[in-house]
Amino acid sequence: MAAARCLGWTLSPLWRWWQVRGLPPSSATGLCSRGRTYSRTALYELLGVPSTATQAQIKAAYYRQSFLYHPDRNPGSAEAAERFTRVSEAYLVLGSTILRRKYDRGLLSDQDLRGPGVKPSKTPVADPAPPRPPPYTPRAPGGSRASPGDGRTMFDFDAFYQAHYGEQLERERRLRARREALRKKQENQANKGTSWDDTRDATFFVVLFLIFVFVGFRI
């Protein structure tokens, strides 16, 4: 179902992404969906997930990209800062099942994007509010982070990465340990097999030599 309302994309933070996707505004007040509809895959493409992705997959993609493009990891990169902002804005929509459903149906309005948030319905709905992106800590001259005394919160990448990727890192660590143990076991078995083969061959030649000597003496 196509959207029936005009979206004020020039006022929306998500407008920049649709503009990059080649959808110019139809007027100075916004994009009217009566004439055209916005792309329903642009936000998914931005996060690098298919439109059929689960909420868990969307969340994982958001954490991964927000970590990679965080301005503190890319000082002085306007492109990274812009990508970080777009990823955060995309997750504000796709991270909410209610806003995502509206987006998929072409019903997402500017009011939805500018609102304080989706109000919970009377019936229980498993739709936790999407987490905000990691805080952006402006850097002081010289590239160093501003100190806590400046009134800003320093961003701890180690804590962020451990909080969202700790379980995955632990699984990978256990997997590497199992692979290493299996490799050593196979090497030990191969060494034992080689040692046994050498012993067997040596024994065979000794027996053959003794038989030859015994037959020689008999003759």
From Swiss-Prot:
Chain segments carrying region Disordered: 109-148
| Pro residues: bias regions | 127-138
Q: Disrupted gene: resulting phenotype?
A: Mice are smaller and have a decreased weight. Neocortical projection neurons display morphological defects reminiscent of Williams-Beuren syndrome (WBS) in human, characterized by less complex dendritic architecture and a smaller corpus callosum. Mitochondria show decreased ATP production. Mice do not show significant systemic metabolic defects.
Keyword Ion transport recorded: no
Annotated J domain ranges read 42-107
Which compartment or compartments is the protein found in?
Answer: Mitochondrion inner membrane
The record lists the membrane-crossing segments as 202-218
The UniProt entry's GO CC annotations, sorted and at most eight, read: mitochondrial inner membrane; mitochondrion
Q: What tissues express this gene product?
A: In brain, expressed in gray matter structures.
Alphabetized CDD domains for the sequence: DnaJ (cd06257)
* Residue range covered by the transit peptide: 1-38
Q: Does the keyword Hydrolase apply?
A: no
The subunit structure is:
Associates with the ATP synthase complex. Interacts with MT-ATP6; interaction is direct. Interacts with ATP5MC2; interaction is direct.
Function description: Mitochondrial protein enriched in neurons that acts as a regulator of mitochondrial respiration. Associates with the ATP synthase complex and facilitates ATP synthesis. May be a chaperone protein involved in the turnover of the subunits of mitochondrial complex I N-module. It facilitates the degradation of N-module subunits damaged by oxidative stress, and contributes to complex I functional efficiency.
Descriptive protein name: DnaJ homolog subfamily C member 30, mitochondrial
The record's gene field reads: Dnajc30
